[in-house]
Amino acid sequence: MKKILSIFIFLGFLNAETLIHTSIYIDGVSDFAKKNASIVVGDDGKIKQIANGYISPDGYDYYDLRDYTVLPGLMDMHVHLGGEYQSKAERPTKVENEMEAIMAVKDAYTTLMGGFTTVRQVGDAGMTAISLRDAINIGYAKGPRIFTSGKSLATTGGHADHTNGKAQGDYVYPEPESGVVNGPYEVYAAVRQRYKDGADGIKITVTGGVLSLAKSGDNPQFTQDEVDAVVTAAKDYGFWVAVHAHGAEGMKRAIKAGVDSIEHGTYMDDEAMELMIANGTYYVPTISAGEFVAEKSEIDNFFPEVVRPKAAAVGPQIGSTFGKAYKKGVKIAFGTDAGVQPHGTNWKEFVYMKQYGMPEMTALKAATMETAKLLGISDKLGSLEVGKIADIVAVKGNPLDDISVMKDVMFVMKEGKVYKN
């Protein structure tokens, strides 16, 4: 009888609901912080109850977070898991896909420990992010929930053409399946390949880029017909479309086509902003990456010479563009371009958003509810509400008083499971 009783006690412990006490929490929806509450998380990993005051912890798996600020799990809409940008001196001449996969596992764990429970991987060398997403979902690795585009789409010589910088005899001419497309027909083939691969969305590089080996960082690289084809094909498969764009003309073509988000947006002009507002297009600014590359451009030989002037110009401009877009009313979702700068420093984006004019609460919502809306999952994630998936983090200090405390994530729960305490 004692043995049977012990088994029931053990099973009861395994199925215990979780109770969190918080003296201050930000729910991702309200315009103000709330105080003195009990959050109950059910065995299904969802928020079961949010009660005023403090429920007795008896019978619960209990976490006392009254010395911290509690928030919804954070979301970063622009990451590249699988390595970080290195100087010319440090950079290996070749990184095999297998090594990239190993680095991606490390980066995913680092990102989760920073409080980011959901990320959007936009651009991959192969199948790394798709495989990592599945491995995390199965439980083989620890990391954030991943939504990924797989390989980016580019035109010949464009920002994401993986044969750039190689002699013609050193590569096989890239096919649409590899991500290099020219004309609507090839666009359809590439989108369908992403569907076959198991991607969640599409990422296109509609203009030049900073780190690619080309002189221009902002020229348009997709025709209107090509961008229209991307969006039409993506909608057929239920994909979102994220667009790398620095130059205004390229991003305007993308916005008119009906894409979901503009990434970077460095040289966005007033017309582009008005189009984004009219079309409900999100802006994912990645100020952190701009600041990082501008800083590194001052170091001799850090970048190839063709990259250096582009890097020097982009940093200050992205911050200025972000501030103007926010004041104008463009919808903004949090994104860092982590992988250009080190993983685990995603929190710095909050500091830059504040620096360039966005209030703390708005910045926190940009990384919770607004990101969830961009992904189309705001009915499941993005806020602390009953029935939502229990992605919960806590920081030491109050980010509404000092946004830099977002670097001090002390507690991480994803789908009701505690990963950091």
State the predicted function of each range:
Residues M1-F10, A16-A37, V41-D43, V105-Y109, ...:
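Active-site microenvironment of metallo-dependent hydrolases
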Residues V29-L71:
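Histidine-rich, glycine-flanked metal-binding segment
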Residues T69-Y140, T156-T163, D225, E249, ...:
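Metal-associated gating/positioning segment near the N- to mid-region
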Residues G83-E100, Y109-L112, T156-E175, V210-T223, ...:
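Active-site gating loops and adjacent loop-to-helix segments of metal-dependent hydrolytic enzymes
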Residues Q86-A89, G158, S212-A214, M251-A257, ...:
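Histidine/acidic-residue-rich catalytic or RNA/ligand-binding cores of hydrolases
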Residues A104-A129, K142-S152, A199-S212, W240, ...:
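Divalent metal-dependent hydrolysis catalytic cores, especially in the metallo-beta-lactamase
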Residues D134, I138-S152, G217-V243, V284-S288:
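Alpha-helix-loop-beta-strand connector modules within alpha/beta enzyme cores
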Residues D236, N301, E305-V306, V314-N398:
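His/Asp/Glu-enriched, well-ordered alpha-helical/loop segment
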